[in-house]
Amino acid sequence: MTAPWADWDHVLKIDPDKSLVDGETFDDIAQTGTDAIEIGGTLDVTTEKMRRVIDACRTHEVPLYQEPSNPAVVVEDEALDGYLVPVVLNAGDPFWITGAHKEWVRIADLDWERTTTEAYIVMNPDASVAEYTGADCGLDADEVGAYATVAERLLGQEVVYVEYSGTLGDPAVVEAAAGGVDDAAVFYGGGIDGYDAAYRMGAHADTIVVGDLVHEAGVDAVRETVSGVRDAQAEE
């Protein structure tokens, strides 16, 4: 069966701890052209905040996923198409490689059919997720490519996520990740602030993830990133 993200060029990540731009709604977000909406954040995330976003998005046809930062904020809701659970391969703290996941699998009636792990490679040392997980961000492109191969070949991961949260990354690093896998999808996130950045990273990643932009600049800016990645993918 083909994975849903096989057809995704663009994912919009909503941080439940952040507000939308004044005057904009989740109805507007659903009309940006994004392929999926992912709800997740690193700091100050609660189930109540998660539910608020889920409730606001439940009536739209855009696929809706939760990316919980820890098992305590998992929300069971039929409006969700699934759960994307990060495994931080370069975490300094093993809790973020298997420890949190040990707790995850103890959730009663865990819906395995809708649960997928994402093999994160965190690359921005100043990002909250890097500090939170103690990630070794001093990796070169070859090392990132090797981590991507580990993710797919040794760990059976379907998604490799190169995360530069808060800053635009090195396209050569994303290209190396793509070169390290055969079938796994390569996601890229971080610093996508407009058409050019989306085009640049979309030339190497299968899917770009846009987050802060929707909270800081709004839906028109998000639409530009959708156009950028689609144009890049069309040229491949």
Curated annotation (Swiss-Prot):
Q: Which Gene3D superfamilies match?
A: FMN-linked oxidoreductases (3.20.20.390)
Keyword Magnesium belongs to the record: yes
So what EC number does this one have?
Answer: 2.5.1.41
| Needed cofactors | Mg(2+)
- This protein's source sits in the domain of life called Archaea
Pfam families noted in UniProt: PcrB
A Gene Ontology molecular function term for this protein is: magnesium ion binding
Q: Which residues bind sn-glycerol 1-phosphate?
A: 13, 161-166, 191, 211-212
Keywords from the named record: Cytoplasm, Lipid biosynthesis, Lipid metabolism, Magnesium, Metal-binding, Phospholipid biosynthesis, Phospholipid metabolism, Transferase
Q: Where in the cell is it found?
A: Cytoplasm
- Matching SUPFAM superfamilies: FMN-linked oxidoreductases (SSF51395)
Query: Which NCBIfam families did the record assign?
Result: GGGP-family, GGGPS_Halobact, PRK04169.1-3
Q: What does this protein do?
A: Prenyltransferase that catalyzes the transfer of the geranylgeranyl moiety of geranylgeranyl diphosphate (GGPP) to the C3 hydroxyl of sn-glycerol-1-phosphate (G1P). This reaction is the first ether-bond-formation step in the biosynthesis of archaeal membrane lipids. Cannot use sn-glycerol-3-phosphate (G3P), glycerol or dihydroxyacetonephosphate (DHAP) as substrate.
Q: How does it assemble?
A: Monomer.
What's the protein called, per UniProt? Answer: Geranylgeranylglyceryl phosphate synthase
- Gene source species: Halobacterium salinarum (strain ATCC 29341 / DSM 671 / R1)
